[in-house]
UniProtKB/Swiss-Prot annotation:
One of its GO terms (biological process) is hydrogen sulfide biosynthetic process. The gene is cysD. Its EC number is 2.7.7.4. With CysN forms the ATP sulfurylase (ATPS) that catalyzes the adenylation of sulfate producing adenosine 5'-phosphosulfate (APS) and diphosphate, the first enzymatic step in sulfur assimilation pathway. APS synthesis involves the formation of a high-energy phosphoric-sulfuric acid anhydride bond driven by GTP hydrolysis by CysN coupled to ATP hydrolysis by CysD. Keywords: ATP-binding, Nucleotide-binding, Nucleotidyltransferase, Transferase. HAMAP family: Sulf_adenylyltr_sub2. It comes from Escherichia coli O1:K1 / APEC. Belongs to the PAPS reductase family. CysD subfamily. PANTHER family: SULFATE ADENYLYLTRANSFERASE SUBUNIT 2. This is Sulfate adenylyltransferase subunit 2.
Length: 302
């Protein structure tokens, strides 16, 4: 394939499809982590392209915390059904029994038990040796230094000082029993690339990414959208309808909205061209402590 004749987005697309096919051929039991966000939607679209007209040769896995937006759950089930994907949903049973939730136990403990431990449980349960993730290098500094093939030991831990070299497009997938690889086919994409590709390919996304009047309150410097009745209002807090959208999606008590009037994909792309902040500024879990994302990844996080 002549790279000089491909547009920037088509080069990224070709690279990602190559990575997805490489993993499917090289590993015995891969899985695609599906978190329902825009990056997951693009990654799923690329995987479907990679194996068209056949079906995906691996399942989707959603590690559920029980605190995603209702629109995310509806979108997840609708998408899996529409594309004929095998969807596995895992929720940490110990965390459920303990009643872990972000309001009572805080973002760090909630994330560790319901997401990190939940993911490790699911990978062990099904014996997956490779897991696709939608992380990109431009999102956060610890992700910027992570390889496309990210080696994890038998405890699912990542050691940033012991990463394998990746020369050109040669990836080292050699692992021993119990070890695994996290694979990031969108590593070289930016947030702007993602949105332009969604618009170019007409990819369906969760409506929460588009601006609309939604019930929100201000807490800890964040606009929190109230998605159900599991919240206790603090003194002086008032729920108001405001025009907001989300740049990133996660558990609703831990994901801040941004004020915006961007109701279409071209308007989002235009908004991104002048944005000077990271999309993850609204993620409470990234504020837990200095280097919190790298620490989480060392412990087995996505």
């Amino acid at each position: 394939m002549d790279q000089k004749r491909l547009t920037h987005l088509r080069q990224l697309e070709a690279e990602s499809i190559h990575i997805i096919r490489e993993v499917a051929a090289e590993f015995s039991n891969p899985v695609m982590l599906y978190s329902i966000g825009k990056d997951s939607s693009v990654m799923l679209h690329l995987a479907r392209k990679a194996f068209y007209p056949g079906t995906l040769p691996f399942p989707l896995l959603h590690v559920d915390t029980g605190w995603k937006f209702r629109e995310m759950y509806e979108f997840r089930d609708r998408t899996a059904k529409a594309y004929g994907c095998e969807l596995l949903v895992h929720k940490n049973p110990e965390g459920v029994a303990m009643g872990i939730n972000p309001f009572v136990h805080g973002s760090a403990k909630h994330t560790d038990i319901m997401k990190t431990e939940g993911l490790k449980q699911a990978l062990n349960k099904y014996g997956f040796d490779a897991a696709f993730g939608g992380a990109r290098r431009d999102e956060e500094k610890s992700r910027a230094k992570e390889r496309i093939y990210s080696f994890r030991d038998r405890f699912h831990r990542w050691d940033p000082k012991n990463q394998r070299p990746e020369l050109w497009h040669n990836y080292n997938g050699q692992i021993n029993k119990g070890e695994s690889i996290r694979v990031f086919p969108l590593s070289n994409w930016t947030e702007q690339d993602i949105w332009q590709y969604i618009w170019l390919e007409n990819i369906d996304i969760v409506p929460l990414y588009l601006a609309a009047e939604r019930p929100v309150l201000e807490r800890d410097g964040m606009l929190m959208m109230i998605d159900d009745n599991r919240i206790n209002l603090q003194s002086g807090e008032v729920i108001k309808k405001r025009m907001v959208r989300f740049r990133t999606l996660g558990c609703w008590p831990l994901t801040g909205a941004v004020e915006s009037n961007a109701q279409t994909l071209p308007e989002i792309i235009e908004e991104m061209l002048v944005s000077t902040t990271s999309e993850r500024q609204g993620r409470v879990i990234d504020r837990d402590q200095a280097g919190s994302m790298e620490l989480k990844k060392r412990q087995g996080y996505f």
